[in-house]
């Protein structure tokens, strides 16, 4: 096994391996400093070229490469391609937060975030996360890509109870299974419900008495919103109004965190317009509920979320193409699920610590936009399929896209 990562994470994994695993680690590549020599008797290779030379000359008995750090500034594409060339398995080392047993490391399939053109931006500040400690928290859309990750993140900060709402029975089943696996089901209660069912929502809120609501439930896809405009308006606008009416009614509600989108700025699609309207409705409520806090969090496209281009491209590549791109000139700002969730949680806590204004809007700097066709080409090049074999089809922009 070869480890790739920063010094701290590599050392942490080596210590874990000594006590609880039996991997034979034969070398390290550290990407954050110029440390040479060895760590706990394991050789540090200077760079990828030195590793390539050793592999080429059969001087290493290696079958896998483990990436120990999830927030590296380096593009790891070369390591991935090198691993493929020498038939090595390559995995992310994932730290598992677990209430059942000792914390554990899992080997996960390689993630697209390792190949972004910018480092992952995780915003963590423990002094703000104390905001969630011992609180009752309500999360709408709790089984979706964003909502389910928010549930898992908040569990790290010892809430009193998390209450989750989702319209999908399958989503509720999946999030229940995931939380049970890590041993925190006693901290969570999940309900299948529609946020437009005002009577049921009011009964649940009266029963649960949450102090914080994170409103993530939404129809989020541009094309689906265009084809189902009544559902998009009902969910994104009237569903938000329903949650705000409950927020106004109950005194135990103190903080309303609204998950929005950068498409709400100068909206050109129905989905963007529904979020624009919902944001302004939040602002109207903030003006009359001066003793309560409102937070609006905007972010762009979320990589690897349900229905995003990454899982679509993966499936198309797995089926040997073609990979479909709407327009060769289209670009998008991207962020990762864990980036989006860290922004949401920090923004809510930051706004509470500010007494100057009871409503604020936060937006993460997502770096430079990424051309969708370049992302497709990169994913094809990193796949196990001959890149000359997979075709890219240009399909044209869908209604509402730009």
Residue map of PLM features:
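Mid/C-terminal beta-alpha module of Rossmann-like enzyme folds, strongest
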Residues: 350-402
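Conserved beta-loop-beta element that borders a ligand/cofactor-binding pocket
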Residues: 252-255, 281-332, 353-361, 390-395
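Flexible, Lys/Arg-rich cytosolic regulatory linkers and terminal tails that connect or flank
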Residues: 76-136
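N-terminal Rossmann NAD(P)H-binding glycine-rich loop of SDR-like oxidoreductase domains
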Residues: 137-155
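A solvent-exposed beta-alpha-beta segment
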Residues: 1-91, 170-174, 189, 193
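Conserved Rossmann-fold cofactor-binding substructure of NAD(P)-dependent oxidoreductases
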Residues: 192-212
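NAD(P)-cofactor binding segment of oxidoreductase domains
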Residues: 71-93, 161-168, 207, 212, ...
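Conserved Rossmann-fold NAD(P)-dependent oxidoreductase catalytic core, especially the SDR/UDP-sugar
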Residues: 86, 101-102, 215, 219-279, ...
């Amino acid at each position: 096994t070869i480890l790739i990562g920063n010094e701290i994470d590599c050392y942490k994994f080596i210590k874990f391996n000594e006590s609880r695993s039996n991997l034979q680690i034969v070398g390290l590549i550290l990407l954050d400093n110029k440390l040479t020599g060895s760590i706990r008797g394991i050789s540090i290779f200077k760079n990828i070229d030195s590793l390539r030379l050793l592999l080429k000359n059969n001087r290493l008995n290696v079958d896998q490469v483990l990436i120990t750090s999830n927030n590296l500034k380096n593009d790891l594409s070369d390591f991935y391609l090198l691993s493929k060339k020498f038939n090595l398995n390559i995995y992310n080392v994932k730290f598992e937060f677990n209430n059942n047993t000792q914390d554990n490391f899992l080997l996960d399939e390689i993630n697209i975030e390792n190949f972004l053109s910018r480092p992952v931006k995780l915003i963590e500040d423990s002094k703000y996360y104390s905001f969630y400690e011992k609180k009752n928290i309500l999360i709408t859309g709790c089984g979706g890509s964003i909502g389910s990750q928010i549930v898992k993140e908040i569990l790290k900060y010892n809430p009193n109870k998390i209450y989750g709402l989702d319209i999908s029975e399958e989503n509720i089943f999946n999030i229940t299974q995931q939380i049970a696996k890590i041993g925190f089901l006693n901290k969570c209660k999940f309900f299948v419900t529609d946020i437009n069912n005002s009577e049921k929502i009011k009964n649940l809120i009266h029963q649960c008495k949450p102090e914080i609501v994170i409103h993530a439930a939404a129809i989020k896809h541009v094309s689906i919103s265009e084809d189902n405009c009544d559902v998009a308006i009902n969910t994104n606008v009237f569903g938000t109004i329903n949650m705000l009416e409950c927020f106004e009614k109950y005194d135990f509600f103190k903080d309303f965190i609204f998950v929005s989108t950068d498409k709400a700025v100068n909206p050109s699609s129905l989905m963007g317009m529904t979020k624009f309207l919902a944001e302004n409705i939040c602002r109207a409520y903030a003006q009359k509920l001066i003793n309560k806090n409102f937070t609006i969090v905007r972010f762009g496209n979320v990589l690897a979320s349900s229905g995003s281009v990454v899982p679509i491209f993966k499936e198309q590549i797995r089926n040997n193409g073609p990979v479909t791109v709407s327009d060769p000139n289209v670009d998008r700002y991207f962020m990762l699920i864990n980036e989006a969730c860290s922004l949401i949680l920090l923004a809510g806590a930051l706004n509470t610590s500010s007494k100057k204004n009871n409503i604020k809007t936060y937006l993460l700097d997502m770096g430079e936009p990424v051309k969708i066709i370049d992302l497709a080409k990169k994913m094809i090049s990193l796949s196990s399929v001959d890149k000359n074999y997979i075709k890219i089809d240009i399909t044209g922009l869908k209604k509402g896209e730009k």
